[in-house]
From Swiss-Prot:
Subunit description: Interacts with host 40S ribosomal protein RPS23. Interacts with host translation initiation factor EIF4E. Interacts with host E3 ubiquitin ligase CUL4B. Interacts with host RNF138.
UniProt GO molecular function: ATP binding; ubiquitin conjugating enzyme activity
Record's GO cellular component terms: host cell cytoplasm; host cell nucleus; virion component
Name recorded for this polypeptide: Ubiquitin-conjugating enzyme E2
Keyword annotations: ATP-binding, Early protein, Host cytoplasm, Host nucleus, Late protein, Nucleotide-binding, Transferase, Ubl conjugation pathway, Virion
Organism: African swine fever virus (isolate Warthog/Namibia/Wart80/1980) (ASFV)
Single GO biological process annotation from the record: protein ubiquitination
């Protein structure tokens, strides 16, 4: 069942490509996706192409997927091993933070929420203590260089680890479709949550139509 849901979502994303992320699927396991997230414009992460893996549990969509960065990240809410601390994907204190997982969530919404998190860290719920301390010093104007320097280092490293094809993909996507401004990611996520689409399976629909036609022919006879 889970693979049927994911196939429908995958098909939706392929038919509606985004300039903000790129997805690919493990042909042998539909529950494992590779994604590349483009750093939001007008932020320290601008220009970066950050790789991550998305793993879907057997209970999906009734349980959230797990996203883990494989690119090195410097961010208060991303663990050193790449695991992500975000309420939309984890149940811990989700209600207090105002966001809970819902089966109506779409992969688009999840990925845009992660991109939004890059520009809006929550240092009060740190996954990387050192990054959180550095970010607080930046916010308090105690150290204006350390945090930006580390982020820019990871941006450069992410590009070094990307293939020319991936870089070209985003270059073409950005030139063809205007990027979402950094302060609009949250609004975009909210709109997408309201605009849920119905998962359909063409083959099954066609089979049902054929069966109905056969029944009608038998009744006529």
């Amino acid at each position: 069942m889970v693979s049927r849901f994911l196939m429908a979502e995958y098909r939706h994303l392929i038919e509606n490509p985004s300039e903000n992320f790129k997805i690919s699927v493990n042909e042998n396991d539909m529950t494992e996706w590779d994604v590349i997230l483009r750093g939001p414009p007008d932020t320290l992460y601008e220009g970066g192409l950050f790789k991550a893996k998305v793993a879907f549990p057997p209970e999906y969509p009734y349980a959230p997927p797990r996203l883990t960065f494989t690119s090195e990240m410097w961010h208060p809410n991303i663990y050193p091993d790449g695991k992500l601390c975000i309420s939309i994907l984890h149940g811990d204190n989700a209600e207090e933070q105002g966001m809970t997982w819902s089966p109506a969530q779409k992969i688009d919404t999840i990925l845009l929420s992660v991109i939004s998190l890059l520009n809006e860290p929550n240092p009060d719920s740190p996954a990387n203590v050192d990054a959180a301390k550095s970010y607080r010093k930046l916010m308090h104007k105690e150290d204006l260089e350390s945090y930006p320097m580390e982020v820019k280092r990871t941006v450069k490293k992410s590009l070094d680890e990307c293939s020319p094809e991936d870089i070209e993909y985003f270059k073409n996507a950005v030139s063809n479709v205007p990027a979402i401004p950094s302060d609009a990611y949250e609004d975009e996520c909210e709109e997408m949550e309201d605009d849920t689409y119905i998962l359909t399976y063409d083959d099954e629909d066609e089979e049902e139509e054929d069966e109905e036609e056969e029944d009608e022919e038998m009744d006529d006879e």
